[in-house]
Amino acid sequence: MSQGSKPTSSDIAINQRVGATVEGFRVVSTRLRSAEYESFSHQARLLGLSDSMAIRVAVRRIGGFLEIDAETRHKMEAILLSIGTLSSNIAALLSAYAENPTMDLEALRAERIAFGESFADLDGLLRSILSVSRRRIDGCSMLKDSL
């Protein structure tokens, strides 16, 4: 294109392609259903964000696909510690039984019940983390809190 002349459509297309590849950035695209896009876009507009900026904020904020809050992480660590302790207790009961084959059924029953309760707690916590609808609500809250 010479100086002073109008740009042609091919000149504009070339300039757009060159401008779109900024060093240090990667373009990420996603396909959303119409309802998903409308909901996402509406929420972004309510916060004064473009779709692109809302996605950027969300990606920076989540830092992972299953980001969990500190309280949930502590609960999970406590449950895992409890399961480890219960496992040790059961191993001790089995060892005691090997030395003296008279079984303390009440102790074994108590450990088995506690073990089941810990697994139920872990199952409930994992279900809440993996719940898609809850994660969507949490994602909206996280986006608002990030601003």
From Swiss-Prot:
Give yes or no: UniProt keyword Transmembrane helix.
no
What Gene Ontology molecular-function terms does this entry list? endonuclease activity
Q: Which domain of life is it from?
A: Bacteria
For this protein, the Enzyme Commission number is 3.1.-.-
Alphabetic keyword roster: Crown gall tumor, Endonuclease, Hydrolase, Nuclease, Plasmid
Question: Which NCBIfam families does the UniProt entry name for this protein?
Answer: PRK13858.1 (NF010432)
Any idea what job this protein has? Tumor formation by A.tumefaciens involves the transfer and integration of a defined segment (T-DNA) of Ti plasmid DNA into the plant nuclear genome. The virD operon encodes a site-specific endonuclease that cleaves at a unique site within both 24 bp direct repeats flanking the T-DNA.
Q: What is this protein called?
A: T-DNA border endonuclease VirD1
